[in-house]
Swiss-Prot record:
<feature type="domain" description="Radical SAM core">
    <location>
        <begin position="40"/>
        <end position="264"/>
    </location>
</feature>
<comment type="pathway">
    <text>Cofactor biosynthesis; biotin biosynthesis; biotin from 7,8-diaminononanoate: step 2/2.</text>
</comment>
<dbReference type="InterPro" id="IPR013785">
    <property type="entry name" value="Aldolase_TIM"/>
</dbReference>
<dbReference type="Pfam" id="PF06968">
    <property type="entry name" value="BATS"/>
</dbReference>
<comment type="subunit">
    <text>Homodimer.</text>
</comment>
<dbReference type="GO" id="GO:0005506">
    <property type="term" value="F:iron ion binding"/>
</dbReference>
<dbReference type="InterPro" id="IPR007197">
    <property type="entry name" value="rSAM"/>
</dbReference>
<dbReference type="InterPro" id="IPR024177">
    <property type="entry name" value="Biotin_synthase"/>
</dbReference>
<dbReference type="InterPro" id="IPR010722">
    <property type="entry name" value="BATS_dom"/>
</dbReference>
<keyword id="KW-0408">Iron</keyword>
<dbReference type="GO" id="GO:0004076">
    <property type="term" value="F:biotin synthase activity"/>
</dbReference>
<dbReference type="InterPro" id="IPR006638">
    <property type="entry name" value="Elp3/MiaA/NifB-like_rSAM"/>
</dbReference>
<dbReference type="InterPro" id="IPR002684">
    <property type="entry name" value="Biotin_synth/BioAB"/>
</dbReference>
<protein>
    <recommendedName>
        <fullName>Biotin synthase</fullName>
        <ecNumber>2.8.1.6</ecNumber>
    </recommendedName>
</protein>
<keyword id="KW-0093">Biotin biosynthesis</keyword>
<feature type="binding site">
    <location>
        <position position="130"/>
    </location>
    <ligand>
        <name>[2Fe-2S] cluster</name>
    </ligand>
</feature>
<keyword id="KW-0001">2Fe-2S</keyword>
Length: 326
């Protein structure tokens, strides 16, 4: 099989990747990874919550849903100066991108001016700017793009087949429509999913097929490991076999060869050895900082120590800007 930018991946092909002996799968993933990226470098992003809790959505995994008693305190939209200070700390830690997350169904037009100012503040600090703020209405993507927003994050979470077991307050089609609006506005897409929602391997395969066959592949693909939150419907979810996480990372690398594959939420529960295996499988991006919105993350010093032990370095800012254009 020859890898091309226009390759169409069907589900049986992706399933066959998952079924490979792990050494063979890792070999193929690393081979593809080296064609497009420096295997000794990792992109670093920092995630900050700009509006916390009281979300109207019913995502069964989320601590921020107003429908579940998780003990999370609601916080209003923070001010621009707080975002600027977060960007300065992120840059000092080695991050090249600040990702801002807001617990909304979608931004209201009245909040757009504040979001625009936040984007400009991040850009003024020399970082790429990413925003995760739910569904985008018509015209909102264009305003954010004009402000200089590099990325908008909107995950698919899981497969179309399993989706209604996870979320019922927004449809899969609405998510795909938001991705289309992001692309049409000229921004890059950050879109991935979650492993451990109770889905089967077939759902992970279907999700990757959906991502790989979008009109333009997402330039950034976060793969999250579920962190069960007390009070949510998934508080007692069974953990996924760690090797299945590695297989998911490797398959993602193979079907999305030019995308940054981010080892996102759930690293705090991973051993250094498992994280190293995921990096060997093709993950080349992570979040720096001890918090991911409302959950724990390894602190930056621990990540720097791990990368040093692995002989790896953080990717410099100039390389991060050279990602595949939409």
């Amino acid at each position: 099989m020859t890898e091309t930018d226009t390759w169409h991946w069907d589900q049986p092909q992706i399933h066959a990747l998952f079924e490979l002996p792990l050494p063979e799968l890792l070999f193929r993933a690393q081979e593809v990874h080296r064609r497009h990226f420096n295997p000794g470098q990792v992109q670093a992003c920092t995630l900050v919550s700009i509006k916390t809790g009281a979300c109207a959505e019913d995502c069964t995994y989320c601590s921020q849903s107003a429908r579940y008693d998780t003990g999370l305190e609601r916080e209003a939209l923070i001010d621009v100066e707080t975002v600027r200070e977060a960007a300065q700390r992120a840059r000092a830690s080695g991050a090249t991108r600040l990702c801002m997350g807001a617990a909304w169904r979608g931004p209201k037009d009245r909040d757009l001016e504040t979001l625009v100012a936040m984007v400009r503040a991040v850009k003024a600090e020399g970082l790429e700017a990413c925003l995760s703020a739910g569904l985008l209405a018509e015209g909102q993507a264009e305003r954010l793009a004009e402000a200089g927003l590099d990325y908008f994050n909107h995950n698919l979470d899981t497969s179309p087949s399993y989706y209604d077991q996870v979320v019922t307050t927004r449809s899969y089609e609405q998510r795909l429509q938001t991705l289309e609006r992001i692309r049409d506005a000229g921004m890059r897409v950050c879109c991935g999913g979650i492993v451990g929602l109770g889905e089967a391997r077939a759902d992970r395969v279907e999700m990757l097929a959906t991502l790989a066959n979008l009109p333009v592949p997402p330039q950034s693909v976060p793969i999250n490991r579920l962190i069960p939150i007390p009070g949510t419907p998934l508080e007692a979810a069974e953990p996924v076999d760690p090797f299945e996480i590695v297989r998911t990372i490797a398959a993602t690398r193979l079907v999305l060869p030019r995308s940054y594959v981010r080892l996102a939420a759930g690293r705090e529960q991973m051993s250094d050895e498992l994280q190293a295996l995921c990096l060997s499988a093709g993950a080349n991006s992570l979040f720096l900082g001890e918090r991911l919105l409302t959950t724990d993350n390894p602190d930056a010093d621990a990540d720097h120590r791990l990368l040093h032990r692995l002989g790896m370095t953080l990717e410099p800012r100039t390389h991060s800007c050279a990602e595949l254009e939409p």
